[in-house]
Amino acid sequence: MAESGQPSALTTAFAPPPPLWKHFTPENVKRLEEIKKEASKGEDGKPRKKTWTPAELRALDLPPELRFLVPPEVPTEGHYSVFGELQSLSTALPSLKDQGIEQLYPSSPAAESGRDTSEPSKPLNHAYYLLKISKSLLLNFLEFVGVLSICPEQFESKVNDLRNLFINAHHLLNLYRPHQARESLIMMMEEQLSQSREEIQQMDKLKAEITDALDRLRRQGVDVDSAAGAAVQEEKPTTAEAQISDHSRLVWDLLDGDN
């Protein structure tokens, strides 16, 4: 009975934690920290700060009840289990045929085997088949409502048809994911480029305003260059940052005085 109830418990929306959580007690955590501190001691007998990897922790002589506290290695290939369902680590989108599901639209010409590669192939019109599947969903839903009103016990076939249509539509949408990622990247780069151009325009505008202000002061007989040199000598900046700051302050003072 316990074995038969385990799969259903794992597939629930809020699955219970695995049984190993019972080993995560304050006493066991403290014991593990003491073992790690003892193993990290140097030649002088003092513990050193060390970041332990799961492999290094498993290499320690730990009692069975403490081995559950060691995190497992991160899987790099194959599958992993989540709530009793196997999930693949591969990022490639599996075909519906590989998943044992009926495909309601033609495969992409590039995926067909035995095709003459010398002839150019027409791309698959995803939008056309998405529209067809959407219309089929509406029709099958109306038929499903009719079946429920006449013969409710025969609902299962229509539910399977609706499920298959939804899966095909979802799979077609997932085929757009690489295109969506490229378009999102293009949009982000265009925004950054536009922001950089705007900042450059603002700096050019400010430079033009400062140049015009200095020219007006020169036309009024103000020796701007001498005033700037005298101010720099009086301040005697000791660092490059101080020189830049003093020069900027002088420019703003000239602009304020002109206004």
Curated annotation (Swiss-Prot):
GO terms for biological process: regulation of transcription by RNA polymerase II. It holds the Pfam family Med7. Its main location: nucleus. Residues 24-46 have a biased composition (Basic and acidic residues). Gene3D superfamilies: 6.10.140.1520, 6.10.140.200. SUPFAM superfamilies: Mediator hinge subcomplex-like. GO terms for molecular function: transcription coregulator activity. Residues 1-55 are annotated as: Disordered. GO terms for cellular component: core mediator complex; mediator complex. It is found in: Nucleus. InterPro entries: Med7/Med21-like, Mediatior_Med7, Mediatior_Med7_sf. Residues 1-11 have a biased composition (Polar residues). Belongs to the Mediator complex subunit 7 family. Component of the Mediator complex. Component of the Mediator complex, a coactivator involved in the regulated transcription of nearly all RNA polymerase II-dependent genes. Mediator functions as a bridge to convey information from gene-specific regulatory proteins to the basal RNA polymerase II transcription machinery. Mediator is recruited to promoters by direct interactions with regulatory proteins and serves as a scaffold for the assembly of a functional preinitiation complex with RNA polymerase II and the general transcription factors. This is Mediator of RNA polymerase II transcription subunit 7. It comes from Aspergillus terreus (strain NIH 2624 / FGSC A1156). The gene is med7.
